[in-house]
């Protein structure tokens, strides 16, 4: 279930935050609809970075579809979200390039 542009709820009840994704004003609905369309009855895979939790104890993940689509990066490319730049993570520079 898509909760927000950067949060999803898994079938097992675990809430995860899409690592590197920051909500963008006026594009929340577009981002949520994009994620709902991409996740529609598909299996997803989670990949963790060196830091698994943020300062608010949110579990942070990179999300991939079964066809290896990198959801975090694809979402940034749509322009519906911004790149989180307040802390370091391994895909930060890649995400910044994708946002340009």
Task: Name each region found by the language model.
Residues 1-100:
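Small beta-barrel nucleic-acid-binding modules, primarily SNase/OB-fold domains
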């Amino acid at each position: 279930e898509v909760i927000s542009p950067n949060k999803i709820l898994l079938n097992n009840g675990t809430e995860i935050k899409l690592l590197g994704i920051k909500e963008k004003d006026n594009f929340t609905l577009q981002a949520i609809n994009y994620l709902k369309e991409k996740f529609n009855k598909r299996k997803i895979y989670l990949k963790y970075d060196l830091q698994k939790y943020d300062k608010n104890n949110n579990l942070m993940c990179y999300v991939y579809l079964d066809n290896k689509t990198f959801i975090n990066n694809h979402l940034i490319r749509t322009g519906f979200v911004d790149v989180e730049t307040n802390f370091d993570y391994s895909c930060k520079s890649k995400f910044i390039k994708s946002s340009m």
